[in-house]
């Protein structure tokens, strides 16, 4: 079990509004990104690994009980979420995603997920795991080690926050915005009620058209990590149709909440260069779309435990 940063969609169930951080990213110590930088038109995953963490008997990162406590989500440990489907959209294949998530769940006493198919996941009354390619089939793309670690992080966090939810992993053929967006549409078509997107890339002039094509799904909660390179906005976090999730540093404390939490300067934030400010944003800091909307633990120095 290793410790990593998290920008998981499930955290948007209940979080506080994030402000804009204009500082440079804080030093990461011995943490490192698991995905390389992306060229124009492509995205990079936003996971980091703490390379100082050893394979100890007990995980050193934050576990499900910590996250439920920190964000007052204890009700989700019961029956909440049963029958609901969270989709994880990432690029490339993680061949061991199903077995890995059940190792994570066993570590924390969470019942294992059953196996189901993409077409049946949304109807399952028993928490189950399904995997599809970007068009809903089961011929998967090639493996990528960095993206596979991101997938482990995302699937583990969905399990931690909503153990009774079904999990649908949709793997895009590549990290292009076109392929990832196609995977988002497929996730919605397969019945997902929440779609997590833990990736991002440089903004581009055609993103207003792309957001309408891939992210405009009324009634579906679509969340996107805001990035992990400090001040600046990425797509698709800039979309008006998503909840952009920023990052914090989270530590246990002796206060009433039991936790202290501060903004993490490595999280992406700022003003979009292209997306019009939506009517539901009333801040005066940006003339266009402001990023981020909510925040959760993301600092690699205070990260979560992940099995990969």
Describe the predicted segments one by one:
Residues 184-185, 258-262:
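Short, surface-exposed amphipathic charged segments that create phosphate/polyanion-binding patches used
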């Amino acid at each position: 079990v290793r410790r990593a940063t998290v920008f998981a969609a499930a955290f948007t169930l209940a979080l506080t509004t994030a402000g804009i951080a204009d500082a440079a990213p804080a030093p990461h110590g011995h943490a490192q990104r698991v995905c390389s930088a992306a060229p124009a038109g492509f995205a990079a995953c936003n996971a980091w690994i703490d390379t100082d963490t050893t394979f100890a008997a007990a995980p050193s990162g934050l576990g499900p009980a910590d996250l439920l406590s920190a964000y007052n989500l204890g009700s989700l440990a019961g029956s909440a979420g049963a029958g609901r489907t969270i989709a994880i959209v990432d690029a490339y294949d993680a061949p061991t995603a199903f077995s890995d998530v059940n190792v994570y769940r066993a570590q924390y006493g969470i019942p294992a997920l059953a196996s189901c198919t993409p077409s049946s996941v949304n109807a399952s009354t028993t928490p189950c795991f399904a995997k599809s390619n970007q068009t809903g089939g089961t011929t998967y793309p090639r493996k990528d080690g960095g993206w596979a670690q991101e997938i482990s992080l995302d699937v583990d966090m969905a399990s931690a926050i909503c153990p009774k939810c079904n999990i649908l992993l949709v793997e895009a053929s590549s990290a292009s915005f076109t392929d990832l967006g196609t995977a988002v549409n497929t996730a919605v078509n397969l019945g997902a009620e929440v779609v997590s997107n833990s990736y991002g890339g440089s903004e581009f002039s055609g993103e207003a058209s792309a957001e309408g094509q891939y992210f405009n799904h009324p009634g579906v909660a679509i969340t996107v990590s805001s990035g992990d390179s400090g001040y600046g906005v990425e797509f698709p976090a800039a979309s008006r149709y998503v909840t952009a999730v920023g990052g914090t540093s989270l530590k246990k404390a002796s206060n009433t909440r039991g936790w202290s939490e501060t903004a993490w300067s490595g999280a992406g934030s700022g003003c979009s260069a292209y997306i019009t400010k939506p009517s539901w944003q009333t801040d005066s800091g940006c003339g266009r779309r402001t990023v981020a909307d909510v925040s959760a633990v993301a600092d690699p120095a205070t990260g979560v435990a992940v099995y990969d």
